[in-house]
C-alpha cells in the first residue's frame, strides 16, 4: 500500500542518434538499471531518455520505478510499439523488480491514488484496490536509503510485518489507518531511521500523524501535520490516476 504523489516524474524518449547521454535525470547523466531493462525489453536500446522530477532519488518515492514506467509509455509512443497498458506496466514492473529497486512500486504508480496491493505481480496476475481520498500530502527528506541493499538481504522479518499490516489495512482501508500501519511496519521491520522517528514523534506531540516513506529517510503526512509540528515540508497532493 502507498501514496501516489502529484509530484511525479516526467519522461521523454527520443529515438537513437542523439549525442546526449543515454539517460538523464534533471539534466544530469544517471545510470538507472530499471530504465535500461525497459529499453531492452521494448527493443529501444538506442533511445535517449530525459527525465525531470522534483523528487529526490533514493528517498522512498519510487523514482526508479516511475522512470521505468514513464520510459515504457514514452517508448511505446516514440517507436509506435502499439503495446497495451498492461503490457507496458508489466515491462516496467519486471524491470524494477529485476533491478532490485522496487517490488510493487510500478503497479501501484500505474493505479494511482492510495493503492492497496492485494496480490503480487504485474497487471495480468496481481490485484490492486485503493483507498478513496483527495488529501494534501507533506513530506520532509533527510537522506537516502538503498532499496537494493534492503531487498537483497534477509527479508523474512520485512515480509511478515508487511503481511500483518496489509491484512489490517484491508479490514479498515482509510488514510489514517494507512499512516498508523506504515509506522508500525517500519518499526517491526526495523527500517525506521532516527531522523524519521524524531519527526514522527514531533508530529504526534503536535496532535498529528506521520510515517516513513519506503524505502527512504523521509517522513510524510497528510493535511498540514508536518507543518503544524514546525517543519518546512514539500507539499503536493494525491494523484488520482498515477
Task: Show where each model-derived region lies.
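ATP-binding N-lobe of GHMP and related small-molecule kinases
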Residues: 1-58, 234-242
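Short, hydrophobic/aliphatic alpha-helical segments
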Residues: 43-55, 92-95, 195-206
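DPxDG-like acidic metal-binding loop motif
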Residues: 61-86
Amino acid at each position: 500500500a502507498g501514496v501516489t504523489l502529484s509530484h511525479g516524474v516526467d519522461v521523454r524518449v527520443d529515438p537513437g542518434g542523439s549525442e546526449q547521454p543515454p539517460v538523464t535525470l534533471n539534466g544530469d547523466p544517471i545510470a538507472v538499471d530499471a530504465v535500461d531493462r525497459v529499453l531492452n525489453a521494448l527493443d529501444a536500446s538506442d533511445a535517449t531518455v530525459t527525465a525531470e522530477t522534483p523528487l529526490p532519488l533514493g528517498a522512498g518515492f519510487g523514482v526508479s520505478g516511475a522512470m521505468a514506467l514513464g520510459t515504457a509509455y514514452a517508448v511505446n509512443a516514440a517507436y509506435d510499439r502499439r503495446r497495451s497498458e498492461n503490457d507496458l506496466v508489466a515491462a516496467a514492473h519486471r524491470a524494477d523488480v529485476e533491478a532490485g529497486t522496487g517490488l510493487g512500486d510500478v503497479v501501484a504508480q500505474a493505479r494511482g491514488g492510495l493503492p492497496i496491493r492485494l496480490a503480487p505481480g504485474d497487471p495480468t496476475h496481481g490485484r490492486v484496490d485503493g483507498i478513496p481520498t483527495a488529501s494534501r500530502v507533506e513530506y520532509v527528506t533527510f537522506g537516502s536509503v538503498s532499496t537494493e541493499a534492503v531487498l537483497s538481504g534477509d527479508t523474512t522479518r520485512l515480509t511478515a510485518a508487511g503481511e500483518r499490516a496489509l491484512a489490517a489495512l484491508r479490514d479498515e482501508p482509510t488514510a489514517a489507518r494507512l499512516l498508523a500501519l506504515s509506522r508500525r511496519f517500519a518499526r517491526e521491520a526495523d527500517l525506521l531511521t532516527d531522523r524519521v522517528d524524531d519527526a514522527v514523534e514531533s508530529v504526534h506531540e503536535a496532535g498529528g500523524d506521520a510515517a516513513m516513506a519506503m524505502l527512504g529517510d523521509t517522513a510524510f503526512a497528510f493535511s498540514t501535520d508536518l507543518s503544524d509540528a514546525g517543519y518546512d515540508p514539500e507539499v503536493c497532493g494525491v494523484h488520482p490516476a498515477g
